[in-house]
């Protein structure tokens, strides 16, 4: 990961020398995350039967923007707590909640149309002081400002609990990046994560297998 002026890397002990050479060979931190460098990183990871899997941008809140934003929601909103999530572990809310680690999902804000949940922002307690926000809106309710309204409301609720909200988006997910900015967040750091080829094939199915076959 990089905060802009540095690179922080975590890897298996046997990969440390190669990773150090990779980082030290770059003219600046940002170059580590550019496409030619990622190709080189993948070649290095071949020896560990792994390759780059996730490429994400993380956003931190601008307190003035979070509390100063005027983001009305066209639907009723409700604050939800962990005990309200049991029936919400569904594909349509997979960015807001994570069924693999339910114990970390702690708070949420839902948008309701005549009692039906149409948008949902949830946050997970990824560490003791910072809670990560994710948001989903049903396709037929998008482009109404629901995502940014829910994200902003949840960020405020997180601050009220004396935690720091943060937000993650895949680099290519421009809509999600725009939502972060509208909701009062600003770029914090960039991150690349490598996973085993088996993990990628299992998680991404045909896409993962295609990439593996092509490699």
Predicted features, each with a name:
Residues 133, 143-157, 178, 182:
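Conserved acetyl-CoA-binding loop-helix of GNAT-fold acetyltransferases
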Residues 49-52, 69-116:
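Conserved acyl-donor/pantetheine-binding loop and adjacent beta-alpha core of acyl/acetyltransferases
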Residues 1-85:
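Acyl-donor-binding surface of acyltransferase catalytic domains
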Residues 13, 108-110, 125, 191, ...:
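Long, contiguous binding/interaction regions
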Residues 52-61, 186-203, 209-213:
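Conserved catalytic-core motifs of GNAT/GCN5-like acyltransferases
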Residues 167-181, 186, 193-198:
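Conserved beta-strand-loop-alpha-helix junction that forms the acyl-donor binding cleft
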Residues 100-107, 112-130, 135-138:
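A conserved beta-strand-loop-helix scaffold within acyl/acetyltransferase catalytic domains
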Residues 7, 129, 158-170:
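Conserved GNAT acetyl-CoA-binding A-motif
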């Amino acid at each position: 990961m990089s905060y802009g002026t540095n690179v922080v890397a975590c890897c298996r002990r046997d990969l440390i020398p190669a990773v150090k050479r990779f980082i030290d060979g770059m003219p600046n931190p940002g170059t580590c995350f550019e496409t030619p460098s990622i190709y080189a990183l993948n070649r290095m990871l071949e020896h560990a039967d792994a390759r780059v899997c996730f490429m994400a941008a993380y956003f931190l809140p601008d307190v003035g923007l979070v509390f100063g934003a005027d983001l009305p929601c066209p639907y009723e909103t409700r604050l939800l707590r962990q005990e309200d999530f049991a029936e919400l572990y569904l594909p349509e809310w997979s960015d807001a909640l994570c069924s693999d680690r339910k114990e970390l999902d702690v708070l949420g804000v839902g948008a309701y149309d005549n009692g039906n949940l149409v948008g949902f922002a949830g946050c997970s307690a990824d560490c003791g002081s910072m809670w990560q926000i994710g948001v989903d809106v049903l396709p037929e309710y998008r482009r109404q400002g629901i995502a940014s309204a829910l994200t902003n409301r949840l960020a405020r609720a997180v601050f009220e609990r004396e935690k720091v909200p943060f937000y993650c988006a895949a680099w290519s997910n421009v809509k999600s990046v725009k939502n972060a900015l509208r909701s009062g967040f600003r770029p914090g750091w960039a991150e690349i994560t490598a996973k085993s080829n088996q993990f990628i094939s299992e998680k991404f199915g045909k896409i993962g297998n295609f990439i593996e076959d092509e490699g």
